[in-house]
Amino acid sequence: IPTRGFLGYRGEFIIDTRGEGIIYSQVIGFRPYIGEIEHRVVGSMVSMATGKALGYSLWNLQERGVLYIGAGKEVYEGMVIGNVSKGYDISVNPTKGKQLTNMRSKSSDEAITLIPPVELTLEMGLEIMNEDEYLEVAPKSVRLRKKFLTETDRARFKRQK
């Protein structure tokens, strides 16, 4: 396996072995480029709204896949906020709040418990990034975003392709 094949594998290895595995690599020599390395195809959860991510909407979205952001984070249209195991992207609204009513009942006021989001690192971002995405590296954060931020631009590009 070439060295570029190990890019991002460390995190997956730790999850697979539950932290008990030992990984070892050795340089045998240099060889010419053979071709692309296949990787697992995952889809992205793409924000379709700009604003502050709310706990209620993230609570509903965490059932669909793994989230990269927590409640209270600023999001913008076209930002990748998580991934889904399906092979295609889905547009979601992480800024949607709970509908307020005058009725009070025990069943409607459930406590929201969020699964802690996965902290996106530079290595992980390079591993899971698709061809139609950019990796934004800022001093305080690492984010994924689509090349075309609006949903209409992404659909137009897909049709031309």
Model-derived regions: residue spans:
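Accessory interaction regions appended to the cores of large information-processing enzymes
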Residues: I1-K161
